[in-house]
Amino acid sequence: MKIAALITGKRVETISSSATLHDLVNALNVHHIGALVVSPDGKKIEGIVSERDVVRAMPGKLDEITDMRVRDLMTQDVITCTPTSTVAELMTVMTERRIRHIPVVDESGNLISIVSIGDVVKAHISDLDSERKALSDYLKS
């Protein structure tokens, strides 16, 4: 299955690198998501920041975190995929790199969506179920 099938109609939330930690936590909570793409315009990707990044910033820095900016927490070397990437490819990358979110970009590198590990697992289960059904139908004939 191609990633294009997973992103149809899916909105991607972004945040500015100058946003505060408070803004970040609020956006994650309001949108019920685990990561935001860091972008100045909703197209160019500067980084990605997740709830895990927030948790990792806390130990020993509780007095400092209120002044932190998204740029202080985000991952700048962002792994991306395209709509033509496959679910199997993303499963491999996400497992090997231990990441939960991958932005989807067009041929110009502009952000068009984001895929989570949950999206990938659901698609993989759907693929397996379709394969199981096809094999079952074949054996019945």
Please describe what each predicted stretch is.
Residues 28-31, 36-53, 94, 102-118:
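A glycine-centered beta-loop-beta connector
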Residues 2-17, 38-45, 106:
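Short, charged helix-to-loop "capping" segments that act as catalytic/coupling loops
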Residues 15-32, 38-40, 80-98, 105:
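The conserved cystathionine-beta-synthase
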Residues 1-10, 50-95, 117-141:
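Tandem CBS (Bateman) regulatory domains
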Residues 1-3, 20-21, 33-36, 53-57, ...:
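Short acidic/polar alpha-helix capping motifs at helix-coil junctions
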